[in-house]
Each structure stands twice: as structure tokens, then as C-alpha cells.
Amino acid sequence: MAKQIQAIRGMNDILPTQSPLWQKLETVLRETVSAYGYSEIRTPIVESTDLFKRSIGEVTDIVEKEMYTFDDRNGDSLTLRPEGTASTVRAGNEHGLLYNQEQRLWYMGPMFRHERPQKGRYRQFNQFGVEVYGIGSADVDAEVLMLSHRLWEKLGITEHVTLELNTLGDPAERAAYRDALIAYLEQFKEQLDEESQRRMYTNPLRVLDTKNPDVQALLTDAPELMEYLGEETRAHFSHLCELLDAVGIKYVINPRLVRGLDYYNRTVFEWVTSSLGAQGTVLAGGRYDGLVEQLGGKNTPAVGFAMGLERIVLMLETLELTKDIPATVDVYVTAMGDASKIEAIKIAQSLRSELPHLRVMSHCGGGNFKKQMKRADKSGAQVALVIGEDELANNQVAVKYLREKKEQELVARDALATYIAELI
């Protein structure tokens, strides 16, 4: 027997028993962004490696350790996209979507990072994100947060997530803070772990994001970025908080919150949860006003967020919020005898035409009544339609209830669509 080929570690199949939950989640996402007037953009999975080096930052973990990068047959360095924002900016610049325009965009698709697989975090993962271009005011920062909050409401998990906010200031403010933070960290250089020592000069704000409790203890008296912010940045952040208060969205200001990507400025945020064990991030984003210009476009304000769908699916399963996911089949059509089978196929096709939203599965492969009913029950259908010799002769269909304790009913063939429409 030939050796079975397995899926690559950290890259998972979504099986038929799992896909209804994914479809429900994706429907909620699409309906919500549509309600806010956002348009979908789809970009290639493979991009030039330089795109991510220039956007994410060459000294970030993603670029240094996690990207799937390879040379193609022409010797060009290509990378499987590790996140969606850079590709969206590249597409916007390339197709003239951004300069002197306002764009509200959303995307959804697979991303790739070579990191250690763990529950809810994989090497291929599905990401959903929104990006807004051309608006620099705090009201649009509030809008993307309101949109994310609406997602939690529709998914039923509002009480299980907390919004954390911070502001990183503009580049000049951050540079002044960077110098102060380096000066503070240098006092403890020998006590820092190897990763923090490396980050201290290349990306010192990321030291604030350390998971090492010993390093966290050293940061207790570290200077805070808020102390280095100018009046304009403070006003922007204050107005954002005012807007969130006005619509009743609760938040926590976390002065240690930084983002793992270099392009963020001013507003940054994360929605976090403790429902998956240790506190984890389920959605993150912020403002990145310099990225469009950094990637060859004109100076364009921008803000957005991204979320990994695997973590949301895991959260819905953990909180047992998957019980109302409907089966993939509404009606299962069976037949007893060759002549009846032809009629059953015609009935199934007719129902699909008359009731386009009805999910109809026809029994294929023959078998006795017991076998067909077993398949019908396994399909998850609400009812089975039985067409035997008697039903065929009388131009009727037997409707057998699979989920309710009700007597089987005989329905005239020409009244079947109306009967099923009222039933399901």
C-alpha cells in the first residue's frame, strides 16, 4: 500500500462537519461590513518579499523568523503573505485607489507564518480585516472599533472580550520616547533576556510586549509614551475615547500596548479574551498613516484591523455557541423502485427551482428503505420525502419527519412545494 501523504504541520483541513460554523462566521462578517458600507478587495496570496520587508519592518519577528520566502525560477524573491494590510496598500497604490480618495475596504483569506503551531494559532490561518484610507480623524478610528464591537454582538461574545487602547504618537514623538526607553533599558541590560537585548536598539517598543515575567518586572518604572505626546496626538486620542463613551463601548487604556508591526502610529488597539485559557488577542489593529507613502504612494491617512478566524471559531466552540448552527440539508429525497427514482429526481429538481433557498439532497446508490432512512437521518435533514409505488400511482409524496415525533403525512405532488415552504 502506498504511503499516505499528510497535511503539512500547522496547516489544517476544515472538514464538512466544521464548515457550517465557518460559513456562519463568514456570513456574519460579510453582512456586518456591508452594513457599514465597506467594499471587498482580493489580493494575491504570493507577493514580492520586498513588500513585507518595507512595510512590516526588517527587524520584526515576522520578517526575521516567520515568513515563507522562496526564489522563483526567475530568481525573484517571493513570499506567501503573512498579513493582509501590506497587500491592500500595494493594490491601492498600483490601481490608483488611494490618492485623494476615501476608501473603506475589507478582505478575507489565508495567511502564512512559520511559527510554532498551537491551539488557535497555525502556520496557515484565515484572516479577516478592514482598512480605511483617506480619513485622518478620530471618528473613523471609532468607526472601525464600533464595527468590531458589532461583530461581537452578532456572534454573541460581547461579554467575553475586552477592548484595550493606546496611542503610539507620531514618528517624532515616538523617536523621543524611543531614546528615553533605550536609556532606561540600558540600566538593566545585563538582566534582560537575549531577545530583549536584541530588541533594545532595533525596536525597543517591542520590549514592552515581552512575555518574560522577569523583564516585565524591570519595566515597572519605565517611562510611558503618554509623557512624550504632543497636544494634537492627545486631542486625537481623547476624541476617540469620547466617541467610544458616547456609543457605550467600554475600553481599558493600556500604556504598554504596542503592535508587532512597525508601521503603526497614533491609535492602536486589541480585543482580548480570557475564554481561551491565558489571555489572548482575538482582534488587533490601529492607525498607519505613513505606510501608503512608505510603499510608493502619496501621504495618505489609514486605519484598520485584522482578526484570525481560527481563534474566533475556537472561542465559539469553547463557549458552546455552536448549537444553533443549522444542518447542511433541509430535505432528503428517497425512492423505492426504478420508476419511483426517476420521479424522485424530478421532484428534487423541482423543489430546488421553486424554493431556491431550500437545501435538497437526493439519495443515490440504491438500497432498501432502512438504508435510505439511515442516510436521511445522518444527513441532518428535517424531513425525508418518500416516493414509492403507491405514492407514484396516486401522484403523492410521503413526508416523514426526522426531528419531530409526528406522524408521516401524504401530500399531493402539486402542493408539495407550498407544504415544504411552510414547514421549513
Swiss-Prot record:
Record InterPro entries: aa-tRNA-synth_II, aa-tRNA-synth_II/BPL/LPL, Anticodon-bd, Anticodon-bd_dom_sf, His-tRNA-ligase, HisRS-like_core, HisRS/HisZ, HisRS_anticodon
Domain of life: Bacteria
KW DNA damage (keyword) present: no
Regions annotated as coiled coil: none
Top EC class for this record: ligase
Gene Ontology CC annotations of this record: cytoplasm
Keywords: Aminoacyl-tRNA synthetase, ATP-binding, Cytoplasm, Ligase, Nucleotide-binding, Protein biosynthesis
Any GO MF annotation of the entry: histidine-tRNA ligase activity
Catalysis performed (reactions): tRNA(His) + L-histidine + ATP = L-histidyl-tRNA(His) + AMP + diphosphate + H(+)
BP terms from Gene Ontology: histidyl-tRNA aminoacylation
Cellular localisation: Cytoplasm
EC annotation from Swiss-Prot or TrEMBL: 6.1.1.21
Subunit structure: Homodimer.
NCBIfam families: hisS (TIGR00442)
Family the entry assigns: Belongs to the class-II aminoacyl-tRNA synthetase family.
Record's protein name: Histidine--tRNA ligase
Name of the gene encoding the protein in the UniProt record: hisS
